[in-house]
C-alpha cells in the first residue's frame, strides 16, 4: 500500500483564485501545496498542510524549498553544458547540505531537459517534472534512472485522468502528482484517484477451524479508530506473522450492546496486526497511528487510531488450518467478537466450531522488527 501524494499547484494568479484551490485541497486531503514565498503565511492561516515554495533559501518557513522556477529548470536560463556548472543543481545541493527538504522543478521540453531532470533528482528529496506534449516516455525513463536514489518523483498533471496514468507508469509509477487545475471537481477526483491507487487488494483465503478453546483471563487490546467500518470489514490479527485472521469490526448490533462500527476488538496484547506491508504488536498502537482496514474481498484502506484500550478479559484460543499450515489467534471470549466467514459474513467466536471456514491472510518469510525478511523461522 504505497502512498501516492497529491500536491496542489497554486503559484499563479491572484490570491483569491489560488485560495479556492488550496481550501479544496485541504478539505479533500491533499498532501502539499506549492505556492510563492509570499503566500506561505496565508496558507498557514487556512489550515495545517505541508507547504512547498519556490526559492533558493529557507527564509519563507515552508517545509520544502523548490529550485528551478525562473532558472534552468523551467527554461528561463539555458541549460549548462556540464552538470557541475548548473546553478539549480548547486543551489539544491547547498540547501540539502543544510538539511533543508528540497525539490527540483523541471519542465521537460526535450531529451536534454530529461537528462537534466535525472541529474537534478540525484541531489533532491523531490523531483517535480512537467511535460509539454509528451508524458509517459520521460516519466518511465526517470523512474528507471532514479530508482536507486532516495527521491520522490512528482509528475505535473492537469486532471485526474493524467494522474491515474502517472500512478500506473511502470510497476511503481510516480510517487505523486502536482495538479495544476482550478476545477474543484478535478481536485477532488485527483485526490480520490490517489487513494484508490493506494488501496491495493490483499489476497485472502479460507482456513478451516480446528480448535476453539476457552482460556483464562488475560489482557486484550481494543482498537477504536477514527473511521466507520462496514459488515465484513476489520483488521488482520494473529499470533503468528505468517498467518492472520480477519477480525470483524463491531459493526453489527447485538442483543447485548449497540454497534460500534469504529471498533475492532482485536486480540491479546502479544498479537500481531498487519499494517500495510508490515506488522506491529497490538500493544504498541497509540492514538494517531495508521492502521489498515480490510474487507472480505481484500480491499484495503487506511484508518487512524483514535484510542487504544487494554483491559483484562476472558480469552479464547482459536486455531485453523490452511493447506498444511496452522495459524492461531487469541481473542476475547465474547459474543460481539467475530471473525469473517468464507462467505463474507461475520461469525461470533461464541458460536465458532470445528469445521467452520474463515478468511485469513497467509505470508511467506519471517519478520524482523515488522519487516518481511528471507529467513527460516518457526512460530508455534
Swiss-Prot record:
Keywords: Amino-acid biosynthesis, Aromatic amino acid biosynthesis, NAD, Oxidoreductase. Its EC number is 1.4.1.24. Pfam families: DHQS. InterPro entries: DHQ_synth (IPR002812). The keyword Acetylation does not apply. It is an enzyme of class 1 (oxidoreductase). It comes from the Archaea. Signal peptide: none annotated. GO terms for biological process: amino acid biosynthetic process; aromatic amino acid family biosynthetic process. Catalyzes the oxidative deamination and cyclization of 2-amino-3,7-dideoxy-D-threo-hept-6-ulosonic acid (ADH) to yield 3-dehydroquinate (DHQ), which is fed into the canonical shikimic pathway of aromatic amino acid biosynthesis. Belongs to the archaeal-type DHQ synthase family. This is 3-dehydroquinate synthase. It comes from Methanosarcina barkeri (strain Fusaro / DSM 804). The lineage of its organism: Archaea, Methanobacteriati, Methanobacteriota, Stenosarchaea group, Methanomicrobia. The gene is aroB'.
